[in-house]
A protein has these predicted regions:
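A general structural signal for well-ordered secondary-structure junctions
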Residues: 27-28, 53
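Intrinsic-disorder/low-complexity, polar/charged segments enriched in Ser/Thr/Lys/Arg/Asp/Glu/Gln
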Residues: 1-3, 29-31, 62-64
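C-terminal structural segments of small proteins and small subunits
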Residues: 39-70
Length: 70
């Protein structure tokens, strides 16, 4: 599973990092670590429009997002 650590970055950087990782490695599963609430919704929309399922788990001030290819 590939991982993108986008903690410390504000929108739209986390989404851009996810797009770059998917373009580079086309992973079956991608874990994304973020602390920018605005990124949750934008990454969720991106996932659905690009053939990935989406799960989000909030842990304090951070989120773990999991994108899995359909």
């Amino acid at each position: 599973m590939a991982t993108v650590d986008a903690r410390g970055f504000s929108c739209p950087v986390p989404l851009l990092m996810v797009q770059e990782e998917i373009k580079k490695s086309d992973p079956a599963e991608l874990e994304v670590l973020i602390d920018a609430p605005c990124a949750v919704e934008s990454i969720q929309r991106f996932a659905y429009h690009n053939g990935y399922t989406f799960r989000a788990e909030e842990k304090g001030d951070e989120w773990i997002l999991r994108l899995t290819k359909k």
